[in-house]
A protein has these predicted regions:
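Catalytic cores of carbohydrate-active enzymes across secretory and cytosolic contexts
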Residues: 1-473
């Protein structure tokens, strides 16, 4: 949504925020559930040798654009979520995203134990047990929150496997109303949509049966099934006692529609989930795709908005996906487009120079190195941006597999090229942090100084500067 709300880490959170903004613009009947993290994702700084340093800064909720949700007594609403043999108590907050309400759960309160207060401390924080507790709060607690608010929707969207347990609670609710399990799961499937974002098995959450049973052991009886039946809903191979419970498999088994986030990712997802539906070819499954989009007003620079307003149809903002409207770009002169392009590029380069000066002052680095680096940043070079989480499967290192060839490319006197890198590695991901350190080490070599640049603390503000200023993203 915005960098002031530290409730996201990468593209998944940014995309979810854009969903809500676009839904508001379209006046869709939609609401959303998430977490109000006390610390959010970390602030990244880099040591002199390129080592990532993760800093966690507590958010002051009183200074954020959020409202307390009040109950009928005028007190802050509390949702009680069953865990094992006790309850976790979550405050409910609301963010008004235009016309859309985003409800955020917060367990950092005195009603909970120290361990349960930390459930909503950090995004992707803690061990696998804390991860499971987070997913129970999001899924089961999310549905309980909607019930307490009196909100009932026709379609429930599970955005990644983290929220898959919404369908456990929904089945429990239908069974409590008198339906059989078979009737309940059909109703749940018919009204559930699951979006998968990751292209690799390592990106899905798997939980050992012992840990999963520690917190979920009481739910099968409420669903009208056995424990083994519940476990099998999360297994590629039902009946395999050695297989762990996968949230993504459970989401596939309890959703009528499953989609990837691009045409190619849809195909990859069909192959990835093919083993769930035995006897069917991958292309026969109900896994499709919906290509990721962005909220145009959020990511379009002011300079480009002025150009569109001057040359495009007055209804442009209300029909951005209409290809006919975009044909007006051919009526804009090359000079005007290039002038706008260079204004944005120079803004980005000025920002990069400012950031490097501040980093040098902070780290008390070699002044000759920073002067040399700033001198070598060339506004006329082709500027390529790379910004994403530094997980190893995202392959940030591919550019550096042939350094001699890369040196020739970036130092070509006629067609110079520069690369801007930015991104955070998970604090527990040593390999991802190693990639960052390796890129910084390479960027300090004489042949790459000012040609390979790494910017610290990737967030939405930096992302907006990059996407508007680079030549290739």
């Amino acid at each position: 949504l915005d960098e002031v709300l530290k409730i996201y880490s990468g593209g998944l959170g940014v995309l979810a925020g854009d969903y809500l903004k676009e839904a508001s613009d379209s006046n869709a009947d939609l609401c959303a559930i998430g977490f109000l993290y006390r610390y959010g994702y970390f602030t990244q700084t880099l040591s002199m040798d390129g080592q990532q340093i993760a800093n966690y800064e507590a958010q002051n909720f009183g200074q954020l654009p959020i409202d307390r949700v009040l109950d009928e007594k005028g007190e802050q609403m509390v949702v009680d979520v069953p865990y094992l043999d006790y309850y976790v108590h979550a405050y409910v907050w609301r963010v008004n995203v235009g016309r859309i309400s985003l409800y955020l759960l917060d367990t950092d309160n005195e009603m909970n134990s120290e361990f349960d207060r930390s459930i909503t401390h950090q995004l992707y924080g803690g061990d696998w047990e804390n991860r499971l507790k987070q997913e129970i709060l999001l899924g089961i607690g999310g549905i309980l929150t909607l019930k307490k608010l009196g909100i009932k929707k026709d379609i429930y969207h599970c955005n990644e496997g983290h929220a898959a347990l919404i369908n456990v609670q929904r089945i429990c609710d239908y069974v409590a109303e008198g339906l059989t399990y078979d009737q309940a799961i059909e109703l749940v499937r018919a009204s559930s949509l699951y979006t998968v974002h990751t292209p690799v098995p390592a990106g899905h959450d798997y939980f050992d049966e012992g840990l999963f049973g520690k917190y979920m052991g009481g739910y099968p009886s409420r669903m009208g099934i056995s424990w083994d039946d519940l476990m099998d809903l999360g297994r590629n191979n039902p009946g395999d006692k050695g297989e762990r419970f996968c949230m993504s498999v459970f989401a596939c088994n309890t959703s009528q529609e499953v989609n990837g986030v691009s045409w190619l990712h849809g195909k990859v997802s069909q192959e990835m989930f093919a083993s769930i539906w035995k006897g069917y070819f991958p292309e026969e499954s109900h896994v499709g795709y919906v290509t990721n989009g962005v909220h145009f007003p959020t990511w379009s620079a002011t300079e480009w908005k002025h150009l569109y307003a001057a040359h495009f149809d007055e209804n442009f903002l209300y029909d951005q996906s209409n290809p006919k409207i975009w044909e007006a770009i051919y009526n804009v002169s090359d000079e005007e487009i290039w002038k706008t392009r260079m204004v944005m590029k120079n803004k980005l380069i000025d920002y990069v120079r400012k950031q490097y000066r501040e980093t040098w002052l902070k780290n008390q680095g070699d002044p000759s190195r920073i002067v040399s680096l700033l001198d070598k940043i060339n506004p006329n070079a082709l500027l390529i941006g790379f910004g994403r989480r530094f997980a190893t499967y995202k392959r940030a290192h591919l550019l550096f597999t042939d350094l001699d060839r890369l040196a020739k490319i970036v130092n070509n006197p006629d067609y110079p090229v520069q690369f801007l890198f930015t991104g955070k590695a998970h604090p527990h991901d040593g390999a991802g942090q190693g990639l960052i350190k390796r890129i910084i080490e390479i960027s300090r070599r004489p042949e790459f100084l000012g040609k390979i640049i790494f910017l610290e603390n990737y967030d939405m503000q930096l992302a907006r500067r990059l996407v508007s200023g680079v030549d290739i993203w």
